[in-house]
């Protein structure tokens, strides 16, 4: 129980986590601190904490998912929450029920947290507004909505980088002043958008790289603007953002590289000439990373297209690839989010209303 002694709930003010636009540096520090404590738990023997015993976490995924859904469900179970999974194919949606009525059904069953993924941007926020209008105290956690946001992925990426730069003390100070390159299909990536918010807010200099068809110039303005009344920063500087079209130039002086999947299922037209040509210009390999001048780590939110975003040899190199570490870190980070959201709220009634 020591891992959750004196939890930082007094520093947490969000019922819902829909994106990271309002997050202050203190909010990021709170998540990293709690994730570090959960990450320190032994991986053998009893793995459950009673922190969310009696709570119900419902995962509403309207898009396919391996890592995110499994990670959230494992995180909830490790906190002793009950877990309820939703499958669109076997739900009343096929009979014409609205998404809101489906969500209200799960709230009526006692859901304390709805973890929502949807192909359309704004759906989790709309659900949160509608549930609040109905007087419901159920929290909504965005697990990815269209091209908009994927906050838990950005938080686990932040945690992974902080642990890499300072394994003993993975704090914001470990990130400040670092240079991170994000390369690939930024246009269709909710992960990239969330990482731009989190990284620049925490003092990281970001270099975006990709072809103009997948990285419009407008992204140069996509930085974190501190919300009004934000608490005093924990690190002095805020990160910068620039676009570089040439990958070899972008990699010079980088401290880490994140590559993004080509999301061809979201492309309405041909945006690249071929996968081979894309890999030649923007794919990562050991040889290309020599441009960094040091042994830099590689991240990828998954799923990975081997031989497209990065070579199979690089993906399988444990001295360079942090991809599996990202997966491992997803569990304690999502434990932290669920704990902060659910433990700070009174358990919902059977009807899910306050």
Swiss-Prot record:
| Coiled coil segments of this chain | none
Q: Tell me the lineage of the source organism.
A: Bacteria, Bacillati, Cyanobacteriota, Cyanophyceae, Synechococcales
Catalysis performed (reactions): carbamoyl phosphate + L-aspartate = N-carbamoyl-L-aspartate + phosphate + H(+)
Q: Which organism is it from?
A: Synechococcus sp. (strain RCC307)
Record pathway: Pyrimidine metabolism; UMP biosynthesis via de novo pathway; (S)-dihydroorotate from bicarbonate: step 2/3
Q: Has the keyword Secreted been applied to this entry? A: no
Q: EC number(s)?
A: 2.1.3.2
What's the name of the protein? Aspartate carbamoyltransferase catalytic subunit
What the entry lists under Gene3D superfamilies is as follows: Aspartate/ornithine carbamoyltransferase
Lineage top rank: taxon: Bacteria
């Amino acid at each position: 129980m020591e891992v959750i002694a004196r939890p930082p709930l007094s520093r947490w003010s969000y019922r819902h986590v829909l994106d990271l636009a309002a997050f202050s540096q203190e909010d990021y520090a709170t998540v990293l601190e709690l994730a570090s404590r959960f990450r320190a738990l032994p991986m053998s023997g009893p793995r459950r904490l009673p922190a969310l015993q009696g709570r119900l976490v419902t995962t509403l995924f309207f898009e396919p998912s391996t890592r995110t859904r499994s990670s959230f469900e494992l995180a909830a179970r490790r906190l002793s929450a009950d877990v309820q999974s939703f499958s669109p194919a076997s739900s009343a949606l096929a009979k014409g029920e609205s998404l809101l009525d489906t969500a209200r059904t799960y709230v009526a069953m006692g859901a304390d947290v709805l973890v929502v993924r949807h192909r359309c941007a704004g759906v989790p926020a709309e659900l949160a507004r509608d549930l609040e209008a109905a007087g419901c105290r159920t929290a909504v956690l965005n697990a990815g909505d269209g091209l908009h946001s994927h906050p838990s992925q950005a938080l686990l990426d932040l945690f992974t980088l902080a642990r890499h730069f300072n394994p003993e003390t993975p704090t914001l100070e470990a990130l400040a002043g670092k240079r991170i390159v994000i390369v690939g299909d930024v246009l269709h990536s909710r992960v990239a958008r969330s990482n731009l918010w989190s990284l620049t807010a925490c003092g990281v200099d970001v270099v975006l790289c990709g072809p103009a068809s997948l990285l419009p110039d407008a992204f140069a303005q996509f930085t974190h603007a501190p919300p009004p009344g934000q608490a005093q920063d924990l690190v002095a500087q805020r990160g910068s953002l620039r676009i570089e079209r040439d990958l070899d130039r972008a990699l010079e002086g980088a401290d880490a590289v994140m590559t993004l999947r080509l999301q061809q299922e979201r492309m309405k037209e041909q945006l690249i000439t071929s996968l081979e040509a894309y890999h030649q210009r923007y794919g990562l390999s050991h040889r290309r990373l020599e441009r960094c001048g040091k042994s830099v780590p590689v991240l990828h939110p998954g799923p990975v297209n081997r031989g497209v975003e990065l070579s199979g040899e690089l993906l399988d190199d444990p001295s360079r690839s942090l991809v599996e570490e990202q997966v491992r870190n997803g569990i304690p980070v999502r434990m932290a989010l669920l704990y902060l959201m659910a433990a700070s709220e009174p358990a919902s009634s059977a009807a899910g209303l306050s």
